[in-house]
């Protein structure tokens, strides 16, 4: 990207603002390398990371990072096989500990179901070294001091040092607080040559004996190590030497521990610096109220309410700036001091920020282009030493731009053609704009030449623009009006400031009538646009409010639906629980009744009534899956039942025939010999009995008409099995509606025959029974007739 443009646009001030949010040396290094890119893929990656950073800052107040020092020199020394000192190791330890913390932080984000675009993949590049981290943090404090936990030997040595120092002070206290205190210059204990001494008056030095280590400048005081503490001081000195050796051994051990992981530690430091940089971008975006820009590889720029990021937010004026879709050149005309220069800088600087992966100070859904280069000629950039005139310097810049620009360049030029004869300046400006158009560049240029107003109408892909001027206050509003050329307000301002009316009138008379008409037309257009913009803004706000209301109502409706479904599901679950309990009790009662009935030899309750009651109980069961119930209801509503249809009664598990529709919700169904009232939603169409497939069983032949055979063959069964089968068969035959059935028991020993006869005698549902005719089996089978 053009370095001169970065300087003109004060891009470095943007980086300086970001620098204030950084806490790591690695983040500072990344910021130093920050520059706009024209690589669309790389730019999208940067913006995705900025989006993640903004979301994390909004939800979690950013990625938690402490102050991290530059560890690259330490790793370089490590590569040279040099032992690291305590502070260097502590700084590396902080990087490793932060690595573990950040990995856990992102793991927690995943558990909270916070969706990220990219950083969840970046964090996977971090390598945690838990054992190494634990050893370093146990052995070192933040300032590099080695802790007592670094080794048992070090702890023991330091205990000895502490004990010896206590013994020395106790001995010294005898001198400073006892009867010998009067021989001291001061009643204190001090240190000389790393040994404890007391300040003794020179004339009493023989009283204490020991070793003289120093004397005062006057010679009146001698610093003496009394003989009584010489041995203790010697022991302390040796302990201190042992401590230093043990500390050096520990530092060498910790250094060796890091050696295999140099590359991983360096990469961790870089990634943490990258996260720090992303944090800084998010915080700066929050300060600016900046938003994520959309990218247009076709360079169709649409900045919605863009603001210059370096102007006080309370004073800056936002503007809509659009270029690249319907037009590629904007000519901003009108007098100076209207805000033209700031508008040009806003376009260029916002574009530079966006192409650097930063959020931009503009409203949501703003679009930036991806320009290969951005050129600018704004203000007087010439050096005094070169003694170039304003016009010469201006032309020199334009020449350089024309040599480098192409169809993927954005050019912003302030006061094009200024600094020379107006007529020649205007002609030159038009020719330069034509050349820029030929190159295919995107151009936003300001000028005060009225001749360029016509240029904006006559050239393709070119549009006029101006800075709004308030006719009431005679002050610029600094709002950009695209599509409306600028007009002169000199005469109006002069009149408002008190210029004599005859002077103003004379001036108007000297002004070309066409110019006056044009200014009047521009004034009308400006007023109409102001009203149109106000209406558009009002409609935008109303639409936004409507969208928000719609979203709230939808959310409330969804919550209501969920609550309703949940209540229904809970109610059905509770109903099913009650039905299950009732079914168990009913089944137990039915079982007890059957046992009593068989024991008494007669039936107090008809078996078909018991079966019907059990089926009705089963029908109370509800499907707890509400959505499934709805589907079933819709499907059942589609069924078209008719009298005479074969149907399956789901609650009974039996096939019957529709006899008559009793009402909208119920049918009378013939189930064997029974006619029952059945709910419509308990019915399903069944296959025509005549077409149903036969399903043979070993000893019972299924008939096509009723689903069971009219003959029961007990031959080959043991007595107990046969009696149980007879009991089940009689129940089924009654339910199926058979008037009579045949039970084949064979002749054999006669045991089965006698058992069947005894059972039939006890069953009061049997009208009569007897042996089959001789030609149909004789006394080897029994024909049973039901009531």
Swiss-Prot record:
Pfam families: MSSS, MutS_V, Smr. Residues 712-787 form the Smr domain. The keyword NAD does not apply. SMART domains: MUTSac (SM00534), MUTSd (SM00533), SMR (SM00463). Residues 685-709 are annotated as: Disordered. One of its GO terms (molecular function) is ATP hydrolysis activity. ATP binds at residues 334-341. InterPro entries: DNA_mismatch_repair_MutS_C, DNA_mismatch_repair_MutS_core, DNA_mismatch_repair_MutS_sf, MSSS, MutS, MutS2, P-loop_NTPase, Smr_dom. It comes from the Bacteria. Keywords: ATP-binding, DNA-binding, Endonuclease, Hydrolase, Nuclease, Nucleotide-binding, RNA-binding, rRNA-binding. GO terms for biological process: mismatch repair; negative regulation of DNA recombination; rescue of stalled ribosome. SUPFAM superfamilies: DNA repair protein MutS, domain III, P-loop containing nucleoside triphosphate hydrolases, SMR domain-like. Homodimer. Binds to stalled ribosomes, contacting rRNA. Endonuclease that is involved in the suppression of homologous recombination and thus may have a key role in the control of bacterial genetic diversity. Belongs to the DNA mismatch repair MutS family. MutS2 subfamily. This is Endonuclease MutS2.
């Amino acid at each position: 990207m053009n370095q001169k443009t970065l300087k003109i646009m004060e891009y470095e001030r943007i980086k300086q603002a970001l620098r204030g949010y950084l806490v790591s040396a690695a983040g500072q290094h990344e910021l130093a390398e920050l520059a706009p890119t024209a690589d669309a893929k790389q730019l999208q990656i940067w913006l995705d990371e900025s989006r993640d950073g903004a979301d994390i800052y909004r939800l979690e107040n950013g990625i938690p990072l402490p102050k991290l020092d530059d560890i690259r020199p330490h790793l370089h020394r490590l590569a040279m096989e040099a032992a690291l000192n305590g502070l260097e190791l502590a700084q590396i330890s902080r990087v490793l500990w932060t690595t573990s913390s950040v990995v856990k932080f992102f793991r927690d984000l995943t558990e909270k179901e916070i969706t990220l675009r990219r950083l969840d993949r970046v964090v996977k590049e971090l390598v945690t070294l838990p054992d190494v981290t634990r050893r370093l943090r146990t052995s070192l404090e933040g300032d590099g001091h080695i802790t007592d936990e670094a080794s048992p030997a070090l702890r023991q040595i330091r205990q000895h040092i502490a004990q010896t120092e206590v013994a020395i002070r106790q001995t010294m206290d005898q001198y400073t607080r006892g009867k010998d205190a009067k021989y001291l210059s001061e009643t204190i204990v001090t240190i000389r040559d790393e040994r404890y001494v007391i300040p003794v008056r020179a004339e009493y030095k023989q009283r204490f004996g020991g070793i003289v280590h120093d004397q005062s400048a006057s010679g009146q005081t001698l610093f003496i190590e009394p003989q009584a503490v010489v041995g203790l001081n010697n022991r302390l000195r040796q302990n201190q030497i042992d401590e230093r050796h043990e500390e050096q051994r520990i530092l060498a051990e910790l250094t060796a521990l890091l050696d295999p992981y140099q590359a991983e530690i360096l990469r961790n430091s870089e990634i943490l610096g990258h996260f720090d940089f992303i944090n800084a971008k998010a915080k700066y975006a929050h300060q600016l109220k900046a938003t994520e820009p959309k990218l247009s590889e076709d360079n169709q720029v649409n900045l919605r309410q863009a603001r210059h990021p370096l102007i006080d937010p309370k004073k800056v004026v936002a503007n809509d700036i659009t270029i690249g879709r319907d037009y590629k050149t904007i000519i901003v005309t009108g007098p100076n001091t209207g805000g033209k220069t700031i508008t040009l800088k806003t376009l260029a600087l916002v574009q530079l920020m966006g192409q650097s992966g930063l959020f931009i100070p503009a409203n949501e859904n703003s679009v930036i282009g991806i320009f290969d280069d951005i050129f600018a000629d704004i203000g007087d950039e010439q050096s005094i030493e070169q003694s170039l005139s304003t016009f010469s310097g201006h032309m020199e810049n334009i020449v350089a731009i024309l040599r480098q620009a192409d169809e993927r360049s954005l050019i912003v030029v302030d006061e094009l053609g200024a600094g020379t004869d107006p007529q020649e300046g205007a002609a030159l400006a038009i020719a330069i704009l034509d050349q820029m158009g030929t190159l295919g560049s995107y151009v936003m240029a300001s000028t005060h030449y009225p001749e360029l107003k016509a240029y904006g109408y006559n050239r393709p892909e070119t549009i006029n623009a101006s800075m709004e001027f308030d006719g009431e206050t005679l002050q610029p509003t600094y709002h950009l009006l695209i599509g409306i050329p600028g007009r002169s307000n000199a005469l109006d301002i002069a009149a408002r400031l008190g210029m004599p009316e005859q002077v103003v009138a004379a001036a108007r008379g000297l002004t070309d009538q066409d110019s006056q008409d044009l200014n009047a037309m521009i004034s009308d257009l400006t007023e109409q646009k102001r009203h149109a913009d106000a209406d558009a803004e009002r409609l935008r706000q109303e639409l936004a409010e409507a969208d928000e209301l719609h979203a709230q109502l939808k959310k409330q409706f969804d919550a209501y639906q969920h609550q309703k479904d949940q209540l229904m599901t809970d109610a059905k679950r509770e109903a099913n629980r009650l039905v299950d309990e009732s079914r168990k009790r009913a089944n137990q009662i039915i079982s007890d009744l059957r046992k009593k009935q068989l024991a008494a030899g007669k039936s107090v309750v008809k078996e078909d009534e018991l079966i019907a009651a059990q089926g009705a109980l089963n029908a109370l069961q509800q499907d707890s899956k509400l959505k499934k119930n709805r589907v079933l209801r819709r499907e059942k509503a589609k069924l078209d039942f008719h009298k005479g249809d074969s149907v399956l009664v789901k609650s009974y598990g039996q096939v019957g025939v529709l006899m008559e529709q009793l009402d909208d919700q119920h049918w009378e169904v013939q189930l064997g010999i029974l006619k029952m009232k059945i709910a419509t939603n308990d019915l399903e169409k069944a296959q025509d009995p005549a077409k149903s497939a036969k399903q043979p069983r070993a000893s019972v032949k299924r008939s096509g008409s009723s689903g069971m055979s009219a003959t029961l063959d007990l031959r080959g069964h043991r007595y107990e099995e046969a009696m149980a089968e007879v009991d089940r068969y009689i129940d089924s035959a009654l339910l199926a509606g058979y008037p009579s059935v045949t039970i084949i028991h064979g002749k054999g020993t006669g045991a089965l025959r006698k058992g069947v006869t005894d059972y039939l005698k006890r069953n009061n549902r049997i009208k009569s029974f007897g042996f089959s005719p001789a030609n149909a089996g004789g006394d080897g089978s029994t024909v049973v007739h039901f009531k």
